[in-house]
């Protein structure tokens, strides 16, 4: 059987620690890889100038029966074009506390389950799930001209 490289789920980062808790949570502590330059969130250009960093805790998709949490430093970089901005992380939307993988999982679940059940299943707040579902509907349906709507049927 082959070894699974769990760090490959989070490109640009290395897993430096893992902690299991009794309440079915797993915490992975990540560290930026030295061979990856941070990129500006606005222009996506690599920049070696790091202003500071903050530790952020984000939610990842469940692994079997365990809730997965990631703890990672998010750096603010001094981009020569854009000024001081947070770095761009491919798998973590800007300012989000949920990874893209977790958001996609929630989007899939809300198509089949009520929001309340998705909230209980994932441990994510009802309002957060509702916002993710609104964004999904906006991208899939687009804007609707309500002036031409005559009836709403449920």
Language-model region placement:
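Short, positively charged, Gly/Tyr-enriched micro-motifs
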Residues: 44-47, 57-154
């Amino acid at each position: 059987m082959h070894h699974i490289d769990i760090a490959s789920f989070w490109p640009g980062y290395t897993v430096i620690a893992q902690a299991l808790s009794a309440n079915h949570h797993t915490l992975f502590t990540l560290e930026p890889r030295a061979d990856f330059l941070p990129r500006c969130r606005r222009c996506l250009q690599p920049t070696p100038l790091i202003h500071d960093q903050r530790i952020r805790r984000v939610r990842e998709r469940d692994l079997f029966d365990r809730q997965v949490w990631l703890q990672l430093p998010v750096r603010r970089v001094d981009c020569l074009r854009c000024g001081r901005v947070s770095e761009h992380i491919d798998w973590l939307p800007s300012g989000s506390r949920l990874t893209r993988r977790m958001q996609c999982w929630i989007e899939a679940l809300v198509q089949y389950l009520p929001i309340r059940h998705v909230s209980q299943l994932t441990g994510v707040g009802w309002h957060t799930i509702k916002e993710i579902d609104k964004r999904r509907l906006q991208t899939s349906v687009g804007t609707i001209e309500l002036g031409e709507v005559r009836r709403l049927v449920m």
